[in-house]
């Protein structure tokens, strides 16, 4: 990276503003469909390259500027000066920390932490969405709820697995029941109609039998 004077830096930004003004005034009516697509591709490449320039500025502010100079934290200063939200400002600071140039304690320049990603961004090959996905791959997993079990109170593996299974099956079961199981069709038992036995039923039966049924044949008639 070249060391430039303040006048040279101002000239570079002025020239960039002037070229953007010219580009804003041109008409694209003479272009064909493939040429329009190519123009959009070049514009996208330029848009992707611009954040790489801002990474160096943000890292320098983070390392050298005090809160008195900034009027608060770096996140608040960026949000106010650039007219963006604080979450967006925090994201830009995090991107600059991973993709921007760094310096060692001795002042020696260091490569970005995500060197390949930073190179691809400077070349306009990847954009903000790509950087977000790549940074998420290298970010350590966050602890859910920020809770850490104190020593001696860690749940046992069996209890923990049952707890996880219970939470996963919670929406699939009614309240107050165990784990959801496949529903079984109720067995249809065939029941005979039950009759109430009258106290005088045995006597009535003997009377009917003696009156309407013939007597059993005797041994002499066989």
Curated annotation (Swiss-Prot):
Residues 182-196 have a biased composition (Basic residues). InterPro entries: DUF222. Residues 160-169 have a biased composition (Low complexity). Residues 142-222 are annotated as: Disordered. Coiled coil: none annotated. GO terms for cellular component: plasma membrane. Belongs to the Rv1128c/1148c/1588c/1702c/1945/3466 family. This is Uncharacterized protein Rv1588c. It comes from Mycobacterium tuberculosis (strain ATCC 25618 / H37Rv). The lineage of its organism: Bacteria, Bacillati, Actinomycetota, Actinomycetes, Mycobacteriales.
